[in-house]
């Protein structure tokens, strides 16, 4: 039976366009991993969607004079279109205004309350006397109580990453009017996370976390405290039996992974299909997030699941990225440090962008996109190594009338066998990189394989042998080079799928209509017995230029 694999990535907030930082950190890694697991023949479900509630949305919608639903509709469509332009292999792109979400969120809350994990408390919150209302976190800014950053948001500091309650800010002010805020008593529901410390520590021991964040998560759980999960807002999911209150966005948003799967199942005509991934055994669940979302995905959401009667699937691996910068600075459209996605893709191929973002992904530390690095990698790696290897072999074969190559008609020498073993080892290395969620290492292996193919072709020098009349030896060299190209297409497909399919089409004996690396024909290549026993046939076609030089 194929392994069931559930993949989710942090829901993009319906409050602005996606930029390269979002793509490189979270969404490209999730897409690459989904493609890789499908190549293995696994039963993969990849769910994402828009996060459509929260204070930041109401703030910006008010500024733009738009209704809240109109505002999130606009950005939901933009996000969905962006994912499609980037070729992401999603099974379903949902949203937290989907028809299943509100009821499920309220049910989560009711079960936590019935389990004694929710209690209402009267506490001091920030109040604007000018606006005559309590202001929830994103309506507030002030000085961070940890690092002293003087424009910290009301729920987390964008400078040091600390998260806290808005009441903890020093010198808090309204983001609407700029007036100083006062403290005033009000009532909210609190999630008693401190009562779940032992259960959370036990859970996190069995969950994959990158080394660079594990200590943070364990420390967070050790010092976890109750959190207010309600807000005084009109836009949000109403809290049962608590008039005037809606759920805090970080209580409702993670439940969107489940409600989004419900919506997917309904769209397939099988409303219970979601249970196969969330309630049945034998599922591997991998979640891709940015480090700024870490407390909510590693602590709050697992705690919410642990407090339910239904045994919802808990995450097995949290893949956490650092920040991705543009020329050393944070992406900011308002400050002009921004790349327009549509304009960029009108000038450069999608595979060029995917490759460079993968090669520079912020996996264990902050990294950056620079146009000089983009140009250098495209020209030296994609054109100079990868594309050059494909083109020179196929151009030589076409010029000298080699259009069919078969294992059964060639005689391999020791140098060929040694080369093929190196090729197979690099394929194993690539699989290891993908299993360990490292796009950077995978791109390095891809280029190593292309470089190996170039070195082999140079050393064998078939153009010299052809002059000596040893046509049969040239056929063996071309066979080995094409075998290398086929495996190069396989291991590069998760990252540069268009180019990989183009290679496949140029050497595969299958028809173009059926040429897809997601077929079992490709999946079998991962199996050790296929890697170790060559039984191939290649039908060569005219070479097509995969990559052009970036000026």
Swiss-Prot record:
Read off the SUPFAM superfamilies from this record. Answer: Anticodon-binding domain of a subclass of class I aminoacyl-tRNA synthetases, Methionyl-tRNA synthetase (MetRS), Zn-domain, Nucleotidylyl transferase
Record's catalysed reaction(s): tRNA(Met) + L-methionine + ATP = L-methionyl-tRNA(Met) + AMP + diphosphate
- Which keywords accompany this UniProt record? Aminoacyl-tRNA synthetase, ATP-binding, Cytoplasm, Ligase, Metal-binding, Nucleotide-binding, Protein biosynthesis, Zinc
| Binding sites annotated in the UniProt record for ATP | 333
List, separated by semicolons, the cofactors it needs.
Zn(2+)
Naming one, the record's GO cellular component terms include: cytosol
Q: Which residues bind Zn(2+)?
A: 144, 147, 157, 160
Enzyme type, top EC level: ligase
Per UniProt, subcellular location reads as: Cytoplasm
Intervals of motif 'HIGH' region: 12-22
One Pfam family of this chain: tRNA-synt_1g
Q: Where is this motif: 'KMSKS' region?
A: 330-334
According to its UniProt record, the EC number is 6.1.1.10
What remark does the entry make about the cofactor?
A: Binds 1 zinc ion per subunit.
Q: Where the protein is mainly located, per its record? A: cytoplasm
- GO terms for molecular function, please? ATP binding; metal ion binding; methionine-tRNA ligase activity
Q: Does the keyword Flavoprotein apply?
A: no
GO BP terms: namely: methionyl-tRNA aminoacylation
Instruction: Indicate the quaternary assembly.
Output: Monomer.
Q: What does this protein do?
A: Is required not only for elongation of protein synthesis but also for the initiation of all mRNA translation through initiator tRNA(fMet) aminoacylation.
Family to which the UniProt record says this protein belongs: Belongs to the class-I aminoacyl-tRNA synthetase family. MetG type 1 subfamily.
This chain belongs to which protein, by name?
A: Methionine--tRNA ligase
Q: Which organism is it from?
A: Chlamydia pneumoniae
Gene assigned in the entry = metG
């Amino acid at each position: 039976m194929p392994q069931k694999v559930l993949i989710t990535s942090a829901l993009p907030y319906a409050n602005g366009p996606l930029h390269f930082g979002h793509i490189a950190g979270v969404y490209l890694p999730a897409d690459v991993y989904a493609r890789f697991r499908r190549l293995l023949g696994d039963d993969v479900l990849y769910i994402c969607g828009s996060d459509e509630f929260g204070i930041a949305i109401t703030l910006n919608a008010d500024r733009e004079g738009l209704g809240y639903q109109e505002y999130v509709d606009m950005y939901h469509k933009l996000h969905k279109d962006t994912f499609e332009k980037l070729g992401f292999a999603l099974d379903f792109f949902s949203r937290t205004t989907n028809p299943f979400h509100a009821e499920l969120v309220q049910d989560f809350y009711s079960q936590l309350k019935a389990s004694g994990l929710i209690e209402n408390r009267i506490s001091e919150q920030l109040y604007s006397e000018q606006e005559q209302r309590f202001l929830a976190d994103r309506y507030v800014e002030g000085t961070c109580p940890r690092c002293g950053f003087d424009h910290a948001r009301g729920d987390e500091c964008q400078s040091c990453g600390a998260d806290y309650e808005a009441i903890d800010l020093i010198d808090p002010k309204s983001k609407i009017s700029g007036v100083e805020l006062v403290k005033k008593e009000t009532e909210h529901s609190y999630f008693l996370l401190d009562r779940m410390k032992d259960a959370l520590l036990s859970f996190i021991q069995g969950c994959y976390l990158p080394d660079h964040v594990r200590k943070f998560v364990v420390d967070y759980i050790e010092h976890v405290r109750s959190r207010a999960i309600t807000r005084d807002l009109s836009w949000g999911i109403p809290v049962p039996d608590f008039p005037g209150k809606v759920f805090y966005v970080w209580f409702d948003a993670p439940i969107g992974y489940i409600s989004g799967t419900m919506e997917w199942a309904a769209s397939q005509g099988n409303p219970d299909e979601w249970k196969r991934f969330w309630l049945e055994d034998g599922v591997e669940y991998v979640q891709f997030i940015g480090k700024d979302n870490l407390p909510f995905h590693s602590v709050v959401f697992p705690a919410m699941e642990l407090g339910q009667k239904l045994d919802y699937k808990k995450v097995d691996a949290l893949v956490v990225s650092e920040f991705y910068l543009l020329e050393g600075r944070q992406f900011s459209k308002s400050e002009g440090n921004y790349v327009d996605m549509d304009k960029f893709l009108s000038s450069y191929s999608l595979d060029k962008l995917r490759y460079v973002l993968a090669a520079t992904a912020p996996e264990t530390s902050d990294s950056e996109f620079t146009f000089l690095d983009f140009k250098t990698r495209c020209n030296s790696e994609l054109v100079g190594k990868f594309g050059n290897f494909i083109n020179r072999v196929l151009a030589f074969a076409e010029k000298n009338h080699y259009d069919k190559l078969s294992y059964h008609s060639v005689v391999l020498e020791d140098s060929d066998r040694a080369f093929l073993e190196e090729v197979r080892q690099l394929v194993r290395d690539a699989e290891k990189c993908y299993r360990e969620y490292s796009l950077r290492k995978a791109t390095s292996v891809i280029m190593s394989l292309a470089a190996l193919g170039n070195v082999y072709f140079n050393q064998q020098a078939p153009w010299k042998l052809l002059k000596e009349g040893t046509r049969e030896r040239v056929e063996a060299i071309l066979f080995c080079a094409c075998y290398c190209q086929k495996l190069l297409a396989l291991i590069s497909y998760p990252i540069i799928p268009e180019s990989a399919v183009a290679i496949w089409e140029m050497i595969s004996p299958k028809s173009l209509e059926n040429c897809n690396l997601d077929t079992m024909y490709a999946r079998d290549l991962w199996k050790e017995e296929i890697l170790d026993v060559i039984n191939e046939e290649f039908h060569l076609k005219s070479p097509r230029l995969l990559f052009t030089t970036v000026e």
